[in-house]
Regions:
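Conserved binding/catalytic microenvironments
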Residues: 1-285
Length: 285
């Protein structure tokens, strides 16, 4: 998890390690007769594998990996681990273009955690809040952005106050900054690019402990600028992504698509710089 969230060469390192990790946890589960600790570790590995393979172009495996994470989480009987696995299932449903199913699934999962919140720990509020963030994005994809806004500005924001920034329980990176990032994402997906860019100016990436969250946010902002034909701003934000994680342009197709679009339509005043950047990230030549 630390490599995935922190290191510039996260794709090559994690993809190289994943096959061995999966084999080891599968062996451990059976060698220890499905013990809670072995199942906890297996669930964690499959929750990690889902976003890694999704961004590396194997989104078709999201459902299978999330299902494995849930199967092992349920064997532990730990409601927080089950909640984290439910978040992974919800994300897989969004990837598979099933927002209605995702919304129902993660909403029910969040409701099951509510009895724990009266004296809840930051970890419990983090998992609960992560489920709400997934639900908010599902709302906008089902055509109900107002409900998504209510989730973000209400219970998600309140839960984030109980967690604070700089935390990363169960790989969910939940906290005030991630709520703000999802607010930008929701407005962008709702077609409100002006509002999305205005809100993006208020996001402090310095307190976000996840490289994936930071680069995804920068992609979202770049895409908003692309829709407003501000190609210079698109280039600036893609350069910011490259400085943080050069491998993004090797593995993430949407990033390459943004560069390809820039190459086609960049104005003469900075077209040469766009071509130089495209060559550097491997889109040209």
């Amino acid at each position: 998890w630390a490599t995935w969230f922190r290191y510039p060469h996260k794709y090559s390192e994690v993809l190289d390690a994943l096959p061995k990790l999966v084999a080891e946890v599968e062996y451990a589960v059976r060698a220890h007769d499905w013990s809670p600790e072995a199942c906890r570790l297996a669930s964690s590995v499959y929750r990690l594998a889902r976003p890694v393979l999704k961004h590396a172009g194997r989104a078709d495996l999201s459902g299978l990996l999330a299902d494995r994470a849930m199967r092992y989480a349920e064997r532990t009987g730990d409601p927080i681990l089950i909640g984290a696995a439910s978040w992974s299932v919800g994300q897989a449903m969004l990837t598979g273009d099933m927002p209605e199913g995702a919304l129902d699934f993660v909403t029910r999962a969040a409701e099951r955690l509510e009895p724990l919140l009266a004296d809840g720990t930051p970890e419990q509020f983090s998992v609960y809040g992560g489920l709400l963030l997934c639900a908010a994005i599902a709302c906008v994809r089902t055509g109900d952005p107002w409900r998504g806004r209510q989730l973000l500005h209400g219970p998600a924001r309140e839960a984030a106050k109980r967690v604070g920034d700089g935390k990363n329980y169960h790989g969910m990176v939940f906290g005030p900054a991630n709520v703000a990032i999802h607010t930008v994402s929701l407005e962008a997906e709702a077609g409100e690019t002006g509002d999305a860019l205005r809100l993006a100016d208020e996001v402090d990436l310095a307190v976000v402990p996840s490289l994936e969250r930071r680069t995804t946010f920068l992609y979202q902002v770049a895409h908003c600028y692309e829709q407003r034909d501000n190609d210079a701003a698109v280039l600036v934000h893609l350069q910011m992504v490259y400085r943080q994680c050069p491998e993004e342009f090797q593995y993430r197709r949407p990033a390459r698509h943004l560069v390809e679009t820039l190459v086609r339509r960049a104005r003469p005043t900075f077209a040469a710089e766009v071509r130089e950047f495209a060559a550097r990230v491997g889109v040209l030549g």
